[in-house]
Amino acid sequence: MKDIKGATSEEIRMIRAIQRSVGALDNGWIGNQTLSDIAAKLGADCFPLNVELYGQPCILARDIDPVNMSGPLPKDAISGGFSWQGQPCSILVRGGKVVRDWSCHYPRPESVLYKTKDGAVRIARVSSAAALGDVVWAVGGLGLLDRYDPAAEGFSGVYSDVLRKTNHTVLGCKGGLLYGVYCKAMTAQQVNALCRDKLKLEYAVMLDGGHVAAINGACSKLNTQTRQFYAVRFL
């Protein structure tokens, strides 16, 4: 959709106040970001929702299902975390069962977005899934926002390649919603800035990128036929 700006200073002031109250970027423009934040606040029945936010295809939903798989990307999904030789190599818990126990660069820890049994979504930097306790799901990746420190998580030297300018996917959360973001042709620093300054996410991890980065939404379908070993479905 085309963003709309208030015609008077008072209309802009009203829009910015609404944006601040729902956690959107208070820029005075009404677009998908503001409307999706309002929808989340009102409990609107429109999720999972596939929209573009600041030019980046996104899927928003109340919950996710991280899938260890082998094949094309399923519907309402983004490509998942780091994998090696056909298996996830970042921490992965699905349905309360540990699929991958160790961090990508064990013993160095990694940032993990996870959901507790009481429904809370949290983030922690750990080396093993066991350190999270009893969780519903957990997805490991490169920490973003205030946890952005690639070297601390082992993404340095030969492993710094994941920071390069390419397509990346992100899993984040804000205001009770999970965000799957397909970031087009960005460095890791640019991905971090998008999540922090525009999307205003509370927690976020960057997942795998390059040739495997993909999104399969109702409208956004990018690289959907590439064989995936790890995906995040939005429910």
Language-model segments: which ranges?
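Zymogen propeptides
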Residues: A39-Y106, G180-V181
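Short acidic, glycine/serine/threonine-rich helix-capping segments at coil-helix boundaries
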Residues: M1-R16, R20-L42
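Short, surface-exposed charged micro-motifs
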Residues: N50, V112, V170
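Beta-strand-turn-beta hairpins that frame and shape the catalytic cleft
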Residues: L53, D118-V121, C173-Y179
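Short hydrophobic-aromatic micro-motifs
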Residues: I59-L60, D76-I78, L113, V121-I123, ...
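Conserved, well-ordered active-site substructure
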Residues: P88-P107, D161-C173, L177-M206, V212-L235
